[in-house]
Amino acid sequence: MDMTKKLILAAWALLLAAAVPAQQKEEFRLWPEAGKYAPERLGAGFDRDNAPYVTLYRPEGKKPAPAVVVCPGGAYGGLAIGHEGYQVAEWFAARGFAAVVLKYTMPHGNYDLPRRDVQQAIELVRANAAGWGVDPARVGVIGFSAGGHLGST
């Protein structure tokens, strides 16, 4: 194949990739403020580094969808949230799942903190199932490394 045909094919591939719809992505506080259970979208004053939150990836297509809470690893000292969180959620959303990436609390010796976060994330998904297009009876958890341990507790 000559160079011109290769360039044309590459250009078409890029155009087609750009035409694929991106999954809808939204971020919410994990823990409600002042007794509210409805999720609150993250605002400008939110402490992203220290407070737990979830990132929801909605799939295109049929509703209600099954959901999966994604717990990234990081040895309970940090989070590999890019490749073990957001990329995994995009993969699930492209296959018809709602995916919720959990940015959980670092335990600093108190492992009840992240355990409560994953339990809260599951409850948050179930409580908002109708608005998020999720089947509340089909909510699972997946995790990597420390996130896998967290998801199993």
Label every model-predicted segment.
Residues 64-74:
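Short beta-strand element of the alpha/beta-hydrolase
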Residues 23-66, 111:
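N-terminal cap/lid segment of alpha/beta-hydrolase-fold proteins
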Residues 143-153:
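Glycine-rich nucleophile elbow surrounding the catalytic serine of serine-hydrolase chemistry
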Residues 72-77, 145:
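Active-site glycine-rich loops that stabilize anionic/oxyanionic intermediates
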Residues 12-21:
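Hydrophobic h-region of N-terminal signal peptides that target proteins for export
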Residues 110-131, 153:
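Alpha/beta-hydrolase active-site loop
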Residues 81-100:
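Short amphipathic alpha-helix adjacent to the substrate-entry channel of hydrolases
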Residues 123-145:
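Gly/Ser-rich "nucleophile elbow"/oxyanion-hole loop immediately N-terminal to the catalytic nucleophile
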